[in-house]
Amino acid sequence: MRQYFKTALLAGVLAAGSMVMSATADTVKIGFNVPLTGFAAADGQSALHGAELAVDQVNAAGGVNGSMLELVVYDDQASPKEAAPLAVKMITQDEVVAGVSGSYSGATRAAATIFAESKVPYISAYAIHPDITRAGDYVFRTSFMGEVQGRAGAKLIGEMLGKKRVTMVTINNDFGKSLATGFKEQAGNFGIEIVSEYEYSIKDREFGPVISKIKADKPDAIYASGYFFTAGPMVSQIRAAGLDQPVVGQEGYDSQKFIEIAGAASEGVMITTSLDRDSNVPETKDFIQGFAKKAGYPADMVAASAHTAILVLADALKASGSGDAAALRDAVAKTDLSASTGRISFNALGEVQKDVQVQIVKDGNWHHHSVISDPVLLAPPAE
């Protein structure tokens, strides 16, 4: 039944797809699926603010080839079941020229399939599952796939921090598994011994049993995947139990809300991510200032990544000079753009190639720790 539903959706898209990109208007519509309700709503709101800021900036500068950008927003609740029909609606009814996902991996994968089959460009802002770009050559990603970020975590712990005995705490979903895969792949190359790995559910907020096991492991460092709403309680409980080893996380922690939840326990926590709060790069500084003014709270990774994805499309729309989907897709593929999350370019699979930022909590805020710039280590797959 599920396959029939998917086939029916795609058939409807393909029947209408030939006319989607041919329309010309005073506005250019970009679809944006994002979780505005449900467990991921806080990330969704940040992503939406980031995307809206990018649209505002592009339009204030004159738009794209004389047309204004319009963001067509739908709440996908971070659910694949919601995202797939919304993708169809964006393409067939709203006639968007392209789409951006401001959502998590499950919803992004579902929408990516629809966009790819209908040959409409689609950019994943921050979802990390490796199969997203494999949906087709119309799909791109402006943040790191999970394996790449996991490799960076291994370099950070094993080489940069010099910690060799590591306990892993892995959230049991696509996000956590892909990060763990990358970390394990490179751990040995940086002299890391993985003492133990413990898994937990996205619904978990009490970590006593796991923390007792970590205590017994006596690791040099803890590599723990999660989101701000799981990592906050986890780190707070780790420190309350008297464990003072470095905790290294990833972009899922990248929110001021993590610091609010973990409180003083957040001090010293490090993450691999895409946004450098202390950057002197004009595009990053302007974004951080503009976001704080628009949203009323500090910028985070999901906001910066959504902002970047919209600017990539705006740049490609200018370069392609037409409403032709294939021309727009080719222009996205040739992107070479300085954005809030770094210099953006894509490989043959549509995966981003850029440095990894390392941030650390100091005095209740995220700050620059270091940059991992290693083209070989960070190279995403090309097929």
Language-model features: where?
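Extracytosolic ligand-binding ectodomains
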Residues: 2-8, 25-383
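C-terminal segment of classical bacterial N-terminal signal peptides
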Residues: 14-24
